Amino acid sequence: MRGPVGTEEELPRLFAEEMENEDEMSEEEDGGLEAFDDFFPVEPVSLPKKKKPKKLKENKCKGKRKKKEGSNDELSENEEDLEEKSESEGSDYSPNKKKKKKLKDKKEKKAKRKKKDEDEDDNDDGCLKEPKSSGQLMAEWGLDDVDYLFSEEDYHTLTNYKAFSQFLRPLIAKKNPKIPMSKMMTVLGAKWREFSANNPFKGSSAAAAAAAVAAAVETVTISPPLAVSPPQVPQPVPIRKAKTKEGKGPGVRKKIKGSKDGKKKGKGKKTAGLKFRFGGISNKRKKGSSSEEDEREESDFDSASIHSASVRSECSAALGKKSKRRRKKKRIDDGDGYETDHQDYCEVCQQGGEIILCDTCPRAYHLVCLDPELEKAPEGKWSCPHCEKEGIQWEPKDDDDEEEEGGCEEEEDDHMEFCRVCKDGGELLCCDACPSSYHLHCLNPPLPEIPNGEWLCPRCTCPPLKGKVQRILHWRWTEPPAPFMVGLPGPDVEPSLPPPKPLEGIPEREFFVKWAGLSYWHCSWVKELQLELYHTVMYRNYQRKNDMDEPPPFDYGSGDEDGKSEKRKNKDPLYAKMEERFYRYGIKPEWMMIHRILNHSFDKKGDVHYLIKWKDLPYDQCTWEIDDIDIPYYDNLKQAYWGHRELMLGEDTRLPKRLLKKGKKLRDDKQEKPPDTPIVDPTVKFDKQPWYIDSTGGTLHPYQLEGLNWLRFSWAQGTDTILADEMGLGKTVQTIVFLYSLYKEGHSKGPYLVSAPLSTIINWEREFEMWAPDFYVVTYTGDKESRSVIRENEFSFEDNAIRSGKKVFRMKKEVQIKFHVLLTSYELITIDQAILGSIEWACLVVDEAHRLKNNQSKFFRVLNSYKIDYKLLLTGTPLQNNLEELFHLLNFLTPERFNNLEGFLEEFADISKEDQIKKLHDLLGPHMLRRLKADVFKNMPAKTELIVRVELSQMQKKYYKFILTRNFEALNSKGGGNQVSLLNIMMDLKKCCNHPYLFPVAAVEAPVLPNGSYDGSSLVKSSGKLMLLQKMLKKLRDEGHRVLIFSQMTKMLDLLEDFLEYEGYKYERIDGGITGGLRQEAIDRFNAPGAQQFCFLLSTRAGGLGINLATADTVIIYDSDWNPHNDIQAFSRAHRIGQNKKVMIYRFVTRASVEERITQVAKRKMMLTHLVVRPGLGSKSGSMTKQELDDILKFGTEELFKDDVEGMMSQGQRPVTPIPDVQSSKGGNLAASAKKKHGSTPPGDNKDVEDSSVIHYDDAAISKLLDRNQDATDDTELQNMNEYLSSFKVAQYVVREEDGVEEVEREIIKQEENVDPDYWEKLLRHHYEQQQEDLARNLGKGKRIRKQVNYNDASQEDQEWQDELSDNQSEYSIGSEDEDEDFEERPEGQSGRRQSRRQLKSDRDKPLPPLLARVGGNIEVLGFNARQRKAFLNAIMRWGMPPQDAFNSHWLVRDLRGKSEKEFRAYVSLFMRHLCEPGADGAETFADGVPREGLSRQHVLTRIGVMSLVRKKVQEFEHVNGKYSTPDLIPEGPEGKKSGEVISSDPNTPVPASPAHLLPAPLGLPDKMEAQLGYMDEKDPGAQKPRQPLEVQALPAALDRVESEDKHESPASKERAREERPEETEKAPPSPEQLPREEVLPEKEKILDKLELSLIHSRGDSSELRPDDTKAEEKEPIETQQNGDKEEDDEGKKEDKKGKFKFMFNIADGGFTELHTLWQNEERAAVSSGKIYDIWHRRHDYWLLAGIVTHGYARWQDIQNDPRYMILNEPFKSEVHKGNYLEMKNKFLARRFKLLEQALVIEEQLRRAAYLNMTQDPNHPAMALNARLAEVECLAESHQHLSKESLAGNKPANAVLHKVLNQLEELLSDMKADVTRLPSMLSRIPPVAARLQMSERSILSRLTNRAGDPTIQQGAFGSSQMYSNNFGPNFRGPGPGGIVNYNQMPLGPYVTDI
C-alpha cells in the first residue's frame, strides 16, 4: 500500500485539481480504452506524465455515495449499476465483442454522478454518520425483522461472519422471500455488527472487527457517506516525494509490530487478493442468473472478510491461510468491478477455466500457460509478463476499494507488494510508470533516500535494444558501479558514532550477442535487464541451459588451443585485438572473413551497400554492409565483384569514381577475359601441362595430363565419357582442369553443372579454388532460405531474372548467367528441377556416378530431362555389380546408341571370357578410361594386408558362451532358425569379439573413473583385441608411424577413445554424426605438418568417400565390415596419392569365432561378385544366406565348449592353420610368401607351447608382425593383370591341377551341404538346461520372471505365415517338399520303373550337378541353365505339378528331355522347397543363394492348386463320360471299348493312367466318407440313387435342393427358389431359346459379369479367396452333393433315352456361386429347343475342363482345335462370320472357366469343412436362418389352398393371398440380406500348423531332414501317405492330391502366353 501522499489539510486542494482535470482525464481514459480494445499496443509505450492526474484522482476521497440513504434514486442507481455490471460481465471479454462504447458510457455516467454530488462533498462536515441498526433498516425498507435470541453456545460457534451469515440468512429469507440481495447483505452486516458488539466473550476487538465488516458490507451495498475533513485555507504545495508503500513479506513484519500508528499498521497488513476468474463453458452468461447471484453472494462475503482483516490483527494469520481459496472466487462489488474489464479466457491458449487475472491490464492466464509456469497463485498484486515487459498500459477501475471504513483514505494501488530484486517486503519505492517496487538498497547503485518528484525504475529507464538478438554467445560480470558516499552527519548526531558506510553497488551480468541481420563484426554487449525485457524467452532458455553463477570458459571457435593462441597473439597484434574482442567468445575467424560479395544496392543518400557472403556460413546468414566498414580484404573483394560483373556483362559496370573514398583507390587488375574463339585445337595432345595450370602453382601427374588429353579429345569428338580411375587417383582434379581448359581455350564459357555427394562438396570447392582460380563457382546447397538467397543473388545479375521466394521457379530465357560452375548435390538436382532444368548446361559432371546405375531412379529420370551438351561421369567402380548397371550408365550417356538392354545382356551372355573382355574393351574404349594405382604408380608404396588372429579373453569367452546358450531355442529350431534372429545372434557375437563392454550388463559392472570413463587396465584386459592393440600402438608410436583405426560400431569407437585417453595418445575421430565442416576440420588437423595426433578413429562407412589421410601409413581394421568393398574403401583413405610410405593393413580377426568365418565368407562373396555378371545376382553381395549364417555361427563353437582337458588333447593333435590371408596391393594371394617368412604358423604363434593353437603375442611376435619388409613382389606383372581384370568384375576361374575338362569349364559356386540337424542340440542342450535351472533358482518363487528373448518365437513366426498367406493353411507346400525331397533318398527302382537297368545304374552312379555353378558365363542350378529353368516354370504354369510318370508324358517338354530322371526330380524337389520358403517375393535370391529370377510364389502355387482341382474333377467323371465329347466321334470296335475303360492313356496326356487310384478326394477321404458326401460308386454305375441326407439342413444346401428340383415343379416354387438364392440378381436372365441367336452370347457375358461381381463381393477380395466365405457347416456339402447326384441321375437318364450316351457332371459349390442357376436355365433352354450341343450348358463345362487338363491352362485355341472337344465349338458356329469371332470365343471361355474355377475351390473348401466335422453353434446366425427357412416353407405350404381358391375367383381368398405373399416377400428379403452377411460369420478352419501344433519351420524340417522316414511316392496326385507315423497313431493326414494351398490363390485366370 502506498505511503501517504498528502495530509487531511491538502484534500480540498486535491479535489479542486481533480475537478479541473476532469475533462482531460476522461479523454485520457478513453484513449487508454482504445488501446485496450486490442488488448495491448504493438510498440511498448510508457507514459509516466499522463499517469500523474490519475494518481491524484486515486488519492482523493470520493463522495459519490453521499446521497441520502434509502432514497429511491440511490436504490435505482444501484440496481442500474448492477444490471450494467452483469451485462458487461456476461460478455466475458470475448474477442468478437467490442467493449469500447459500453465502457465509455459507464465512465460518462460516473462522471455525471461525481459532478452531481460535488456540492454535497464540499459542504460535508466530514463526520461519518452512526450506522443504522438492523431494526431501523428493516423498518425503513418495510421488511419483517427476525427476532432471535442468541445463546452462549451461539456466541461460541458463530465466530466469524461466514458462519453467522449461513445461520441467519435462511431466517431472514424465510420471513422476507423477495428481499433483494443488496438489502440482504446490508441487513446481515448490521446484524453481525450488533452480534459482535453483544458478544460477552470477545470484548472490544471483536466489536471493532464487527464494525469493520459491517462498514465494508455497507460500502458494498448502500454506500454510506464518507467523512471528509473540514475545508481549510489552501496552502502552498510542498515538493512531492516519490511514492512509497509498505510491502509484505518477512521483512515487513518487524516494522509492523514496532509501529505505534494503528493506521499504518492497518495499511501494512492490507493485502489485495490476487484476482482469479473461471472462464465459463459458454462465452455469455444470462443476466441476473441465479448462479451469478450465488457467486456474487460468496464474493461479497469474501470482500467483507478482506476488509475486516485490516482491523482485526488477531485474525490476520487465519485469513492469510485462507487467501489461496479466497483468491479463486470472483469478487463482484457494488455495480462495477474488475470482472467487467477482464477477458474471460487465457491470453495464451484462448481457453476458459481457472484463470488468473492481471492487476494492471485486462489479460488473464492459466497458471500452466505462464513461462515459467506457476504451481500456485502468487500473493498480492500481480502483473502479467506483458505488463512487466511493456509497462502499464491500463488500470482497472475499483471504485469500492477507494473507500475505507475509517474515513477518507487513499485508494489501494497496483504496485507490487514485494521488491522486484530480493522478493521481500518492507518499505518499497514505487515506480511511477509500471507496477514495479524496489527497496532503496536493492537498486544498483543503491539510493540513500527517497528521491523527490517522479521516479522511474530501472526497467522503465532501460534503453531499447538496437535490433533483434539472434543468439547469445557469452556472458560476463560487469564492474560494480562506484560506491555512493552518504552525506556528512548533521550537528545533532553524536560525533562518537562511526561515519556511515558508503553504499556499494553490485556487479551485473552482460551478454555478448549476435544481432539478427547483422554480421559477427557487429556483435556487442548488452545488459541483462535489456535481454530480460526484450527477449524474455531467449533469456530464460539461456538461463535454464547455462550456469549463471560462473561465466562460461572462453571458447576459441577456430579450434586453436590456448597455447597456440597465445603464441599467435604475441606475433600478430591484429589477431590479439580480434581475439580479445571476438574469437574468445566462440566466433570463428572464418565467420568474419568475406567469402565473396554477392550484390550491391544504393540507399537514399546514394551510398553503396554490399551483400556479403561470409566464409563457412550458409547463404541465409549473408548480410548487407556499408561501403566503408573496416574489414580485411574488403576493397580487393569489391574490386573482384565489379570486375566479375564487367567480365560477364561485357560492359564497364564499375563503381562510379565519386563513390570511391579518398586514399582508397582500388587495384585495377582486371580479370583475364577468356578468348571468344578457340585458340587451341582440343584434339592436339599436351606434352606438358598448359600455361593456365602453371599459373595455379599446381603440377599434374603424367597420367592426369593423359586423362586431360583424353577428355579434351572426347569432347571434340562429341563422345560422352566415363572417367573410371581407381579411388585416389585424382578424378576430381582431372575433371576441374578439363572444365578449366574448355573455358581458358575459348571452347566453352559454361555454365557447368557438377553433381556430387554432399560429403565431398567441400573438397570440390577447395579443388576448384586451387586448380581453377578464375572460375566463379557457386555451391547450391543448404536449406530453403539459403537456396532462395542463392537463386536471387548468384544465378544472375538481373533482379527480376527469377521470382524471389522459397518456391522454385524457372529462370527467364536469355538471361546472362552469373556463375561458371554450379556445384550441387544429387537430391537438389531432383528437388529444384524447375530452376536447374531451365538452364542450358554446357557440361554435366556426376561424381560417384553409380547413383545412375538404375534407370528407374528419380535422379536418373530427372537428370535425363535436363538440357546438357556434354556428359562426364566419374566413378571408381564402373562394374560394381553387373553388366546391367554398366548398361544404364552407357544408356544415360548416349541413349541413341545404348537403348536395348536385353540385346546388350544377350550379346555378352554366351561368349567365353577372353572374347567378352575384348568385346567389352572395344565397346567401352571410346567412352571409358580406367587406370589403377598399380598401372600409374609403378613406384607407389605397396600395401600389405595381414589378417591378425586374436584370442578371446576370459571375459569374452564367458559372454560368447552365454549368448549361444541364451539363444539355444532360436539356433536349434528346425531348419536353422529365421534369418533375422540368426543375424541378431551374430551381431551379439561380433560385439563380444570386439569388447564385452558393448553389452549394457558388462558396461554397468565395469570399473569407472571419476570422470565417467572406464578404468584403462580393466578395459584392456577384457578384450583380446585391445591387449594386442596396446602392444602394437606402443611400438608404432616409437617408430614414428601414424595409425588409422576403423570400426563398424560407433560405441566401439567410444571405448577406443577411452583406451587412447588412458594410453595418453592424441587422436581425431570421424563417425556418421560428424558432418561436412567438422569432418574436414578434423582431417586438416590430422594432416597438418607436425600434427601431434597419433591415431585417427573412423567408422568404416562414414570414413569412406572424399577423405584423404595419406599422412597415415598404418591401417588397423578393428572389426571387418559385412561388405568387403567397404573395408577396401576404408583403407584406400591412406593408400592413395601423396602416400610416400608403405601402407600396412592389419585386419583383426578373433580366432575360432564368427569373425574368422565371416572373413572367409566375405572373401568368397567378393570372388562371387567378380564372377557374376548376370543381372540381379551380385547386387546385394553383402547379405548372407541362412545356411551361411548358420555355418558362421557354428564356427569354433565346438572347441569353445570343450572341457579344458579335452580341449588340450584335441588341440595338441590339430595342425595349426597357416596364414592364407596376406594380400599385397598388387592383388593376388600371398599365402606362399607368408609361409616362407613365417613357417607354417602365423606370427604370434608360440610353437614351444604344447597348446599350439592358442596365439600368444610377445615382443618378438609383435616386432615380426610390424615388420614392413614382409612384401611379395615375385610375380608383379601377373598380379597387376589380375587386379586389372578384377576391377572389371569379370570372372576369375579357379584352375585346378587335374586335367578334367568339365572341371575347368564349370566353376562350382556353391554345393549343397549336408548339415547335421542336431548340431546345436548336442552342443548346447546341456548348457541351456543348466542355465534355465540357474535362472529359476536365482529368480526364486514369486519373483519376477525374466522374459526370455527368443528371436525365433514359433507363435510369432506362425503369425507371419498367416499374414502372408491366408488363415486356412493348406498342406500342399509341406507335403510337396516331403515328396520331392524323396527323389534323392528313394531307391531308383521305385520311382523310375520304366527305365532300363543300365540307365538306372548310370544315373545312380552319376553324382548330381552342383547346386550353383557357372558354365560358359551362365549360371546353372542343379545343372539346369536359364532356358531350361524357364521351360520348367512354363510347364508348371501350364499343367500344374508334374505327374508321377512325367518322363513318359508330354509334360517333359523338349528343353528338359536331356535331363536324367534323377536330375529332374532333384530340381523338382528344389523348386518345391523354394515355393515353400517364406520370404518376400522381392528378394533377389532364395535362402540357399539360388537366384529367384522374378518367381512369384503366390501365382505358381495358385496355378498348381487350380490345375490339381480341375484334373481331379475331370477324373471323377471321366469313366462315365468317356474320352470324346460327341458320340459320333467315338471309334468303333475294340478301340472304342478300350477308350471306355481306360482314359488318358495317350502318352501326350499328362494325367496319370489310374485316375481312381491317383485322384481321390483332396483330403484323402476314405470310401465311407465319400459315400456320405454323396459320391457315386464308380464300380456300379447303375446304382445312382443318392444317399439319405442328414437331419439338419443348412441354408445353401436347401436352396440348392429347391433349385435342382424337377422341371415340372410349380411356378410358385420356382419363384421361391429364385428369391432364395444368396447372390442371385433380381431378374433371372431370359432363357436362351427366347433370344435371337446373336444375343445369346452377349447375354451370357452379362450373366457372367454379374456372377463375377457377386463372387468378388461374397469373398471380399478378388485376388484371394477368404476361407470365411467357403467354410460352411458340415451338412452343406452333403445336401449339395445329393442334389448334384439327382441332377446327374436325371441328365444320365435323358442321355440314355435320347442318344444312349451317358453323361454325368456336377460341382457341389454349396450355393455360393450362381453356377447351378445358370446350368438350370441353360439346360431348360437346350432341352426345350432340342439344341443340346448348340446352347452352352453343364456338358460344355465338363469338356472345357477336360480340354484344359489335356492342353494346359488357357490354351483355348489348342482345345478348340482338338477333335475330342468339338462340342465346345458348336455354340459359336453362328458367330463365325464376325470379325472378332476368335477374340469373343476365347474371352467367353476364359470367363466361363473363371466361374468354374471359383466353384471348384468352394467345393474343395466345403469338403474340407465336412471332413473336419466343423459344426456351428445352434445360436449362430446361420442356424437361425435355417429355422427361418422352415418358417417360410411352412407359411407357403399352409396357404397353398388360398392359391387354388383365388384362381377359382374367390375375392376374399384373393385378398388374403396378397397379404400372405407380401409377408413371404418380406421374410425372403430379410433372409437374403442376412445371407450376404453369412460368410464372414462361418467357422474358420484352423491353419495346418495349428492343427498339428507345430510351426511351419518344424513341419518342413521334419519332412526334409529325417532320413529314416518311410518313402513316399512322387507326384502331386499319387496315393502317397502324406505324413509319416512320427505324428502319432491318431493323426490322419490328408490323402494325396489335397496338398494344394487353395486359400492363397487369387481366383482370376492367368491368361498369359507362358
UniProtKB/Swiss-Prot annotation:
Coiled coil spans: none
All residue ranges annotated as the Helicase C-terminal domain in the record: 1028-1193
Subcellular location: Nucleus; Chromosome
Reactions that this protein is recorded to catalyse: ATP + H2O = ADP + phosphate + H(+)
N5-methylglutamine: modified positions: Q1390
Biological processes, Gene Ontology terms: cerebral cortex neuron differentiation; chromatin remodeling; negative regulation of cell population proliferation; positive regulation of signal transduction by p53 class mediator; regulation of transcription by RNA polymerase II; sperm DNA condensation
Region (Histone-binding): 343-653
Zinc fingers classed as PHD-type: ranges: 343-390, 416-463
Biased amino acid composition, Basic residues: 96-115, 251-272, 321-330
Domain Helicase ATP-binding stretches: 712-896
Compositional bias per record (Low complexity), positions renumbered to this chain: 1554-1564
InterPro entries to which the protein is assigned, alphabetical: CHD_C2, CHD_II_SANT-like, CHD_N, Chromo-like_dom_sf, Chromo/chromo_shadow_dom, Chromo_domain, DEXHc_CHD5, DNA/RNA_helicase_DEAH_CS
Enzyme Commission designation: 3.6.4.-
Domain comment, as recorded: The PHD domains mediate specific binding to histone H3 unmethylated at 'Lys-4' and may preferentially recruit the protein to transcriptionally inactive genes.
Family: Belongs to the SNF2/RAD54 helicase family.
Disease tied to this entry: Defects in CHD5 may be a cause of the development of cancers from epithelial, neural and hematopoietic origin. CHD5 is one of the missing genes in the del(1p36), a deletion which is extremely common in this type of cancers. A decrease of its expression, results in increased susceptibility of cells to Ras-mediated transformation in vitro and in vivo. Parenti-Mignot neurodevelopmental syndrome: An autosomal dominant neurodevelopmental disorder characterized by intellectual disability, speech delay, motor delay, behavioral problems, and epilepsy.
Protein name: Chromodomain-helicase-DNA-binding protein 5
Annotated gene: CHD5
